[in-house]
Regions:
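Short, acidic Ser/Thr/Gly-rich low-complexity loop/linker segments typical of extracellular
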Residues: 54-71, 147-164
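Short, ordered, surface-exposed loop/turn motifs in non-cytosolic proteins
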Residues: 37-54, 131-150
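Glycine-centered loop-to-beta-strand initiation motif
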Residues: 30, 66-77
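Short strand-edge motifs at loop-to-beta-strand transitions and within beta-strands
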Residues: 72-74, 111-113, 165-167, 203
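Bacterial Sec-dependent N-terminal signal peptides
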Residues: 1-39
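A short, solvent-exposed loop/turn motif at the edges and junctions
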Residues: 79-105, 183-191
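A short, amphipathic beta-strand motif
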Residues: 28-34, 70, 121-130
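Extracellular beta-sheet/turn segments enriched in Thr/Pro/Gly and aliphatic residues
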Residues: 101-120, 124, 190-209
């Protein structure tokens, strides 16, 4: 009887520590880079959310604020989570998000996820029409610049008719080129214009026709 009790006690310890070992923890680390100034991004808020299997609801797992080295580090329990989403936010910077699937994470290893973002900047496309006529037709399209964001300008061809002096504001990555290709119908006036936009500010791009 005594041997049976010892065996059962040993089995209980094995199950207890075996389960704890099986649960384990993940370590997720990385560096947030500021592409506008080519350096680590200080003071960025990094948040990790997990979506549980079956209910599609996100819950905050961990959060941190980057120091001068731009680094963040999370250690969190392995749970029944389908995937995680990493959010990077800072005022006057483009918010970034990165999906990290549960199947991609490894135990007993440091899982590296680096993220790059850029300072916000703006271009003012300032259009002047000299000697305007009702049948004037200007078209232009973005050739290079920020695309694919909720704040980004229309990516197709822009048309202006008749007498129109106007300004169009578009967002861009700071310290990056923003250029347009334009053409005035019925004339030889065509070309490409571009400026490098100043971070946190508005840079003027003049288009005269």
């Amino acid at each position: 009887m005594k041997l049976i009790n010892v065996f059962l006690l040993s089995l209980s310890f094995m199950l207890l520590f075996g389960c704890n070992k099986g649960a384990g923890t993940f370590t997720l680390e990385g560096v947030i880079t500021d592409a506008s100034f080519n350096q680590p991004l200080t003071g960025a808020t990094v948040e990790l959310y997990g979506i549980s299997s079956g209910n599609n609801q996100y819950a905050l797992v961990a959060s941190a604020v980057t120091g001068e080295d731009g680094k963040y580090a999370f250690t969190f329990d392995r749970t029944r989570t389908e995937k995680y989403t990493l959010y990077v936010k800072k005022n006057q910077y483009f918010e970034q998000e990165l999906e990290v699937y549960y199947s991609q994470l490894k135990l007993k290893e440091i899982n590296i996820r680096n993220v790059t973002t850029a300072a916000k900047s703006w271009v003012e496309i300032k259009i002047f029409n000299n000697n305007a006529a009702n049948n004037d037709h200007l078209q232009f399209i973005r050739q290079q610049g920020k695309i694919g964001c909720s704040e980004c300008c229309f990516s197709g061809i822009n048309h202006l008719y008749g007498f129109q002096d106007t300004s169009i504001f578009c967002i861009n990555d700071g310290n990056s080129l923003y250029s347009i290709e334009y053409a005035v119908f019925g004339t030889s006036n065509t070309g490409i214009l571009g400026v490098t936009t100043t971070p946190f500010d508005t840079t003027v791009l003049n288009l005269t026709y």
